[in-house]
A protein has these predicted regions:
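A conserved amphipathic terminal alpha-helix motif
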Residues: 18-25, 144-180
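Intrinsic-disorder/low-complexity, polar/charged segments enriched in Ser/Thr/Lys/Arg/Asp/Glu/Gln
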Residues: 37-43, 81, 91, 104, ...
Length: 180
């Protein structure tokens, strides 16, 4: 159905999911609210080619910045875990979970501490690309935020931080890719 209107299928799926979610807006329960605190999604359309966008988003920890995107030092350990070093944001451990080149890449990281990657608390960051409106749409979804801590207040803070962080990071990615 989405292709009939010239809308990319992934974008159509997101729009359909958004409309479905909004139809239940007034029927949220406590369980729904808890689920809502588990996932952050955001998008940006960038005026660049898909190869340039992929070169950025497929690098482990590309989002670890404090301000504009900068140069990272990324090293792969013997355990398959990447150490991403940023002069301002510090060192972070990140694992590449899945990858389908030029389409989607997923990582695992622990947003509350830079020196560990505990299985039970790590979140999943999935980044997908699609060609839209003459540019490239970068879609980010971070899930698992409700379980980053056994402390509900700390998990809520991680969710709130992720919302602001991803909006800022995608704006920085747009500026970086369009300014090349």
């Amino acid at each position: 159905m989405g292709a009939r209107f010239g809308v990319h299928s992934r974008a159509w799926e997101r729009l359909t999911r958004y409309r479905w979610c909004m139809s239940f807006f007034d029927m949220t329960s406590d369980a729904d609210v808890e689920d809502d605190l588990d996932r952050v999604e955001t998008d940006v359309v960038v005026d660049c080619d898909i190869e340039a966008a992929w070169a950025l988003v497929s690098e482990p920890g590309w989002w670890v910045n404090d301000g504009p995107l900068g140069d990272h030092e990324v090293t792969l350990g013997d355990d398959g875990i990447y150490r991403v070093s940023d002069p301002d944001a510090g060192d972070w451990l990140i694992e590449k979970a899945d990858e389908d080149p030029m389409d989607v890449v997923a990582f695992r990281w622990y947003p509350l501490a830079d020196d560990e990657l505990p299985d039970e608390y790590a979140t999943r960051v999935e980044v997908s690309l699609s060609e839209e409106r003459g540019g490239v749409a970068i879609h980010v979804e971070e899930s698992g935020l409700a379980s980053v801590s056994d402390d509900e207040a700390e998990a809520r803070q991680a969710y709130d931080d992720a919302i602001g962080m991803w909006e800022q990071v995608l704006l920085a990615a747009k500026n970086y890719l369009e300014g090349r």
